[in-house]
């Protein structure tokens, strides 16, 4: 009886435990139900999940936004010849996954790798063996590209490959810039290169150098957009365009450059570079009356189309670099001495050497030409003669003219990164040597601007690279006119005297530029050489 009683007690306990567990489970289920009910009520009222509006999310599933790309403006020369224009490049890739089948149940993957490699090798700069390596990757891949050899393809290359009708061979299109002349004022025209835009998730052409960078906001234009309603299969619904803004194409820019002169200059510089293996060369042809630059180039340079010669350390030598001008600076010191009344052409001076503050200034002909009149100093390019004129002017007067000539002031040339230069002017020696272009650093545009006094009766004119900016509709937005810089620096009579001195450089037997004489032509010249800083950077080598 006792055992029977124990069994009954055990059964009662088990039943009680089951009942309690059941009650707990009921409570848990009820709580879960209440939580889900509360969550459902909250979502139905607030219409949000994790901070995201459900209506907006649902609407987005049936909408497609498309960026309408603007065409970048074209860059022309002064005569309307194209220098840079929009284009496209292509990257070829191969689909390898056998699941890629089109709606006609035909393969969209590479079927015959050997044949595909053989055909592609006739167009791409890759061998058949190299292409086969790409088509047989070590790890499984849905698709593969062909490295640099399969990118930046032209439309002609793309068409050749398409004509082969190779299954699985596809293309990715990307915006590009076509520079039709290759090496052509590359530092001035600059570059526009494709850069991925995270905001629009598309690739944009962005100016990174030269005119392309400086006028990027004009050239770039503004992308448009199109918002469309689609069905569950992502087909656009009839009348499904909800919002639309047309792309605004970029403005066209007409440069002052003359293509014929520019190409001729490029050829000349290449010949000089090849002959003398120069470390650096610069050249500018400018209409000093208007400031319009007709041609300009440098060495080293690069091919804008192929990028050959372009390095990360590339510098625009005309704008972003400064140099000691040497004897060509004598045009300015000569003009300042004349205009300030300190030039007596018939006054004699002893050439050859001059001591200033214990240091000796030498003429390029260190023995000199004896006692000669000051009017021979400029044609002979006499350092001593110009130093004497600087001493006659005095530091205050000479420095005031340097300021008027814009030395150490940026010209505002429409190119990125212009350097202002500097001048050493503390000691008597510093002041004297600036008269023949030492102790002063300038950029090329500063010198061209200062030289413009010779064509404008003493008035400086700013160098210009842009003729006009024209909208896509043909409206002239900006028309660049002659821009005077400050007040007249020197008088018209001073200019005439300087020009006579420059003609004497060519025409007089003692002139340094007699080799430039052309029969029947009146030519004004100033030759120039310079000393360069020695290895200790505190002295000059002698030239």
Regions found by a protein language model. Give the residues of each.
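Beta-lactam-recognizing serine transpeptidase/beta-lactamase-like catalytic domain environment
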Residues: 2, 84, 231-241, 281-326, ...
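Periplasmic/cell-envelope proteins involved in peptidoglycan metabolism and beta-lactam response
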Residues: 1-305, 399-404
């Amino acid at each position: 009886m006792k055992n029977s009683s124990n069994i009954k007690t055990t059964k009662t306990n088990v039943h009680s435990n089951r009942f309690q567990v059941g009650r707990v489970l009921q409570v848990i289920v009820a709580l879960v139900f209440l939580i889900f009910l509360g969550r459902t009520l909250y979502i139905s009222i607030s219409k949000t999940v994790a901070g995201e509006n459900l209506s907006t999310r649902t609407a987005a599933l049936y909408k497609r936004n498309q960026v309408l790309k603007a065409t970048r403006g074209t860059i022309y020369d002064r005569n309307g010849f194209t220098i840079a224009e929009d284009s496209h490049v292509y990257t070829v890739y191969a689909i390898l996954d056998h699941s890629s089948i089109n709606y006609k149940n035909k393969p969209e993957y590479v079927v015959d790798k050997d044949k595909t490699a053989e055909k592609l090798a006739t167009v791409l700069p890759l061998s058949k063996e190299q292409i086969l390596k790409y088509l047989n990757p070590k790890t499984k891949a849905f698709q593969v590209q062909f490295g640099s050899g399969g990118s930046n393809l032209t439309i002609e290359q793309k068409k050749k490959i398409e004509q082969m009708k190779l299954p699985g061979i596809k293309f990715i299109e990307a915006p590009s810039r076509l520079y039709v002349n290759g090496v052509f004022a590359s530092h001035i025209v600059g570059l526009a290169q494709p850069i991925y835009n995270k905001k629009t998730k598309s690739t944009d052409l962005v100016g990174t150098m030269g005119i392309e960078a400086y006028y990027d906001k004009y050239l770039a234009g503004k992308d448009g957009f199109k918002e469309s309603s689609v069905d569950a299969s992502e087909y656009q619904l009839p009348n499904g365009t909800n919002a639309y803004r047309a792309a605004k194409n970029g403005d066209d820019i007409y440069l002052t450059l003359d293509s014929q002169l520019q190409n001729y200059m490029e050829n000349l510089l290449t010949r000089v570079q090849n002959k003398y293996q120069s470390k650096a060369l610069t050249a500018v042809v400018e209409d000093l009356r208007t400031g319009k630059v007709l041609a300009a180039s440098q060495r080293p340079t690069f091919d804008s189309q192929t990028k050959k010669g372009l390095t990360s350390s590339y510098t625009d030598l005309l704008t972003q670099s400064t140099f000691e001008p040497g004897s060509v600076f004598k045009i300015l010191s000569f003009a300042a001495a004349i205009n300030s009344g300190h030039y007596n052409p018939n006054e004699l001076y002893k050439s050859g050497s001059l001591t200033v503050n214990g240091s000796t200034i030498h003429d390029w002909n260190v023995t000199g030409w004896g006692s000669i009149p000051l009017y021979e100093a400029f044609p002979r390019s006499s350092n001593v003669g110009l130093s004497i004129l600087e001493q006659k002017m005095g530091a205050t007067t000479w420095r005031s003219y340097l300021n008027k000539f814009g030395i150490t002031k940026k010209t505002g040339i429409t190119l990125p990164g212009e350097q202002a230069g500097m001048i050493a002017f503390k000691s008597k020696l510093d002041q004297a040597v600036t008269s023949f272009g030492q102790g002063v650093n300038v950029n090329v545009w500063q010198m061209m601007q200062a030289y413009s006094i010779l064509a404008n009766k003493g008035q400086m004119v700013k160098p210009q690279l842009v003729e006009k900016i024209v909208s896509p509709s043909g409206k002239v937005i900006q028309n660049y006119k002659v821009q005077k810089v400050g007040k007249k620096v020197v008088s018209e009579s001073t200019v005439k005297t300087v020009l006579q001195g420059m003609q004497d450089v060519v025409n007089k037997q003692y002139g340094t530029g007699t080799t430039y004489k052309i029969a029947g032509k009146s030519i004004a010249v100033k030759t120039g050489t310079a000393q360069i800083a020695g290895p200790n950077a505190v002295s000059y080598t002698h030239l």
